[in-house]
């Protein structure tokens, strides 16, 4: 029998992309209200400690788990080795706090934080570059998995993986060590069909 835990991102209370939203809301309120609502855990947000002992203590006080944490990947401008080095501190924090999934999104050239830039200006990858990018991303995912943490790729508006077609290219060009985070909101906004994508990649959806 599969056990599924339901967690939440703190952007319901505070927003990392627009810090003014929820700026006055303390972390304790996010956690206590999340627990009261029945969630089993939280993803990281900008108000969370980044030292494992402190983070574990804060979560334990509310009987909550750390379910994941976003990482802004830059593999398009890094070598595999440099990306692994850059990711290491975040990876270790997740491990030390009992999380087995890392939310990963390629943000090189992204525009989702630029309110005055139209989505038509977002970065894209040429068709003949997907295989190389996928191979390199798979190597990063393999490393993280060897450390007990699976990468869950977050398709996101304003980035290189936004549409259903780009999710297809990502999945086709990466190994199964890379999981998929299915964000139904982002995919609907991009004009996709979340149900169809779920059915197509349900064996790779990990978050």
Where are these regions (language model features)?
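N-terminal pre-domain/capping segments
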Residues: 1-100, 145, 179
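A short, acidic/glycine-rich surface segment
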Residues: 16-19, 111, 189-192
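Short beta->alpha connector loops
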Residues: 45-50, 158-159, 185-188, 192-193
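Generic recognition of short, well-ordered alpha-helical segments
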Residues: 53-54, 162-166, 192-196
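Short, surface-exposed basic-aromatic patches at helix termini and helix-loop junctions that form
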Residues: 56-63, 168-174, 198-202
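A general structural signal for well-ordered secondary-structure junctions
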Residues: 65, 177, 204-207
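Active-site acidic/histidine proton-transfer and metal-coordination neighborhood
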Residues: 80-182, 189
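Aromatic-lined glycan-binding groove of carbohydrate-active enzymes
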Residues: 193-207
């Amino acid at each position: 029998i599969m056990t599924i835990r339901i967690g939440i991102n703190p952007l319901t209370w505070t927003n990392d992309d627009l810090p003014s939203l929820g700026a006055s809301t303390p972390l304790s309120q996010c956690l206590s209200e999340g627990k009261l609502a029945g969630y089993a855990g939280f993803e990281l947000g900008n108000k969370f400690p980044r030292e494992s002992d402190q983070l574990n203590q804060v979560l334990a006080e509310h009987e909550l788990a750390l379910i994941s944490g976003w990482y802004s990947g830059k593999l398009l401008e890094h070598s595999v080795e440099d990306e692994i080095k850059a990711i290491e501190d975040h990876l270790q924090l997740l491990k030390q706090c009992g999380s087995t999934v890392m939310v990963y999104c390629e943000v090189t050239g992204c525009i989702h934080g630029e309110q005055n830039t139209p989505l038509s200006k977002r970065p894209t990858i040429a068709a003949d570059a997907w295989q190389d990018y996928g191979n390199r991303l798979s190597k990063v995912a393999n490393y993280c998995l060897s450390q007990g943490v699976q990468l869950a790729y977050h398709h996101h508006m304003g980035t290189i993986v936004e549409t259903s077609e780009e999710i297809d290219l990502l999945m086709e060009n990466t190994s199964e060590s890379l999981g998929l985070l299915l964000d139904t909101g982002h995919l609907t906004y991009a004009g996709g069909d979340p149900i169809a994508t779920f059915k197509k990649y349900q064996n790779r959806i990990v978050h």
